[in-house]
Amino acid sequence: MSKNRKSSRKKHRKIVVVNDKMQKNYRYELTEPMGKNFDLLFRPELTPKQMLALGVFGGHYMTDCKKEFPRDWFAKAKLNPKKHDDTINYFDKHASQSLSVWRQKGWINEEHDPRGWFQWYCRYYMGRRIPDEDARQIRRWRAYKRHLTQVVKNCRPRDYYCRPKQRQSLLHWAYDARKI
C-alpha cells in the first residue's frame, strides 16, 4: 500500500516557474494532487476558484499571475486589473488591509508568497508543501475562525446586512460566509 502511495505522489510532482510582477524565476514543486491531502487541521470551505468567482480582495488580487494557476479558476473570476473595486466583493464591502500593512505586521513570507495568505492557499491547493510555512498559515487560518463565531453569535442566520464587512473578510479566508 505504501508503495502505491509513493508512486502516486511521484506522478504528481511538477516544478512550477513563476514570473510575475512580484516574483521572477521563483520555483516551487507540486508534491500532492490538486485539492487533496490537506493537513487535518486545515479544512477550507471554499476553493480558490470559488473564491475568485464570488468576488474577493476587490478583484485586484493576482491579476498578473493567471499563467501560474489553472485557466478555469479565472473563467468566472471577478477581477479588475486596474484597481481595487469593493463592488466586486461578494458583500460589496472593503474588508482587507493593504499589502504594506500585512508586511508591517509580519504576515508576509516574502520568499515564498509575497502576496500573502491567499497566494499561499492557492499554491497549497495546487499541491505545494512547505511544512513550516504551511503550519504557520494554517494556524493563522484557524485563528480567523473567531470572526465566524462573532457573526454566528451576533447575527440571524443569512442576514447578510449584519456584519457584511466581517462576512467578506471570512470569504477572503475561505470560510463560506454565505452559509451563516
Briefly describe each language-model feature range.
Residues 116-123, 169-176:
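Short, hydrophobic/amphipathic alpha-helical patches that form generic packing surfaces
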Residues 124-149:
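Short linear, low-complexity motifs centered on an aromatic residue
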Residues 12-116, 128, 146-169, 180:
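Compositionally biased, intrinsically disordered low-complexity regions enriched for acidic
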Residues 1-16:
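Short Lys/Arg-rich cationic patches that frequently serve as NLS/NoLS or arginine-rich RNA/DNA-binding motifs
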Residues 6, 173-180:
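Eukaryotic terminal intrinsically disordered regions
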